[in-house]
Amino acid sequence: MPDWYKKWQNVSHIYKLPASFPKMTAKEFVENFKLEKDSLLKEFTNIESHTEVQNLIQSMKLNEEQSKILKQILSSTLRDTFYTILLGLDGCSAIGKSQELYEIKDENGNLISGEIEGYAYEYFHEME
């Protein structure tokens, strides 16, 4: 048995994970995608960030009105991308050339897919 494993065994009791994690729902799954979309938009449009996207935006030297329009373009692009991916995973839209239902499960093996479409519409169109 390697030394690193012996050391890990001695402290593994400190990092006990619960026997089972709470079931993730389709709603929570979609919420996480929405949070990611919002986070990316904030990062892309934050003058202080050093992302490639922000660097390219800065290089265009846009005025305030142009920056506002670009932010709307980025938001719409991210919204449509995330929404299409979610619908594709739920079998309601094609991903590339294929349209099929994918089984998405949480860490406990509970099925998440099958109810994504409705929540995706709610979070990416009704709440926008």
Regions found by a protein language model. Name each.
Residues 1-66, 95-97:
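N-terminal low-complexity, intrinsically disordered segments
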Residues 2-6, 17, 21-22, 34, ...:
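Polybasic, proline/glycine-rich intrinsically disordered low-complexity segments
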Residues 29, 33, 37-40, 53-57, ...:
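Generic structural signal of hydrophobic/aromatic residues within well-ordered alpha-helices
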Residues 42, 47, 51, 80, ...:
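Generic alpha-helical propensity signal that fires on short helical segments
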Residues 64-116:
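Amphipathic protein-protein interaction modules
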